[in-house]
Amino acid sequence: MIESFSRLTQAGPGSPRRATVQAAASGLGSADDQVFSRLLENRIVFLGSVVEDAVANAISAKLLLLAAEDPAADIYLYINSPGGSVSAGMAIYDTMQYVGNDVATVALGLAGSMGQFLLCAGTAGKRYALPHARIMMHQPHGGIGGTAADISIQAEQMLYTKRTLQERIAFHTGQTVEQIETDSDRDRWFTAEEAKEYGLVDHVVVRADQVPSVVSGAGMGLRRAGRTGFGPGGGSGR
């Protein structure tokens, strides 16, 4: 998979082949695609919708593409999402762990449910929230129906999913699994500062230059006319 992406990107950032990969990964066909392609050239991936299979495929493809282009450079994942499918979110999460790059995360607007999960899964020390971002944590939801046997199987899977998410959030935040279970039993809302205190993020930032990579001219910058402007891992705690 990585080798395939490498071959597609050998011609460089401005190549037609790379533009084709970007367009396919974005899932967009409008003028917005130009914006997201430009961000991708600067190693910025934007999650700005409900997390579903198509979105997860696009985000995961972008992470793999950026990892293939430069296995060492940070990737920045901006999150403004109310959450969505657990399986789709876990696909993004596992890809964040799969690539060798640090994946910094930045919350703006709302990072709720699976959005919160992906936010806290950023590389330790590189998880950011803008000052008015809201973060919401809760337990996974899902409908159960069918025969008694079906209901039993579905309930077992729900408990497994719930426990897995709690264990991963505990790992990334430093909280105990028991504390996460208690706090996520109902919707738990955090301001940016409260999220920092809880361990969901590491920094609350107001300006791009408060992120070290911006100062060094890497990652978050929109490279234009010599200017560097803008730019966020995972289960291993890297």
Swiss-Prot record:
Active site: 113, 138
Main location: cytoplasm
E.C. designation(s): 3.4.21.92
Leading EC class: hydrolase
Assigned keywords, A-Z: Cytoplasm, Hydrolase, Protease, Serine protease
One GO cellular component, as annotated: cytoplasm
Reactions catalysed, as given in the entry: Hydrolysis of proteins to small peptides in the presence of ATP and magnesium. alpha-casein is the usual test substrate. In the absence of ATP, only oligopeptides shorter than five residues are hydrolyzed (such as succinyl-Leu-Tyr-|-NHMec, and Leu-Tyr-Leu-|-Tyr-Trp, in which cleavage of the -Tyr-|-Leu- and -Tyr-|-Trp bonds also occurs)
Short name of one Pfam family: CLP_protease
Family annotation (SUPFAM superfamilies): ClpP/crotonase (SSF52096)
Localization annotation: Cytoplasm
Top-rank taxon: Bacteria
Gene Ontology BP, a term: protein quality control for misfolded or incompletely synthesized proteins
PROSITE patterns for this protein: CLP_PROTEASE_HIS
Single GO MF annotation: ATPase binding
Family matches, as HAMAP family: ClpP
Subunit structure: Fourteen ClpP subunits assemble into 2 heptameric rings which stack back to back to give a disk-like structure with a central cavity, resembling the structure of eukaryotic proteasomes.
Family indicated by similarity: Belongs to the peptidase S14 family.
Function: Cleaves peptides in various proteins in a process that requires ATP hydrolysis. Has a chymotrypsin-like activity. Plays a major role in the degradation of misfolded proteins.
Name of the protein in question: ATP-dependent Clp protease proteolytic subunit 4
Organism field: Frankia casuarinae (strain DSM 45818 / CECT 9043 / HFP020203 / CcI3)
Species classification: Bacteria, Bacillati, Actinomycetota, Actinomycetes, Frankiales
Gene name as annotated: clpP4
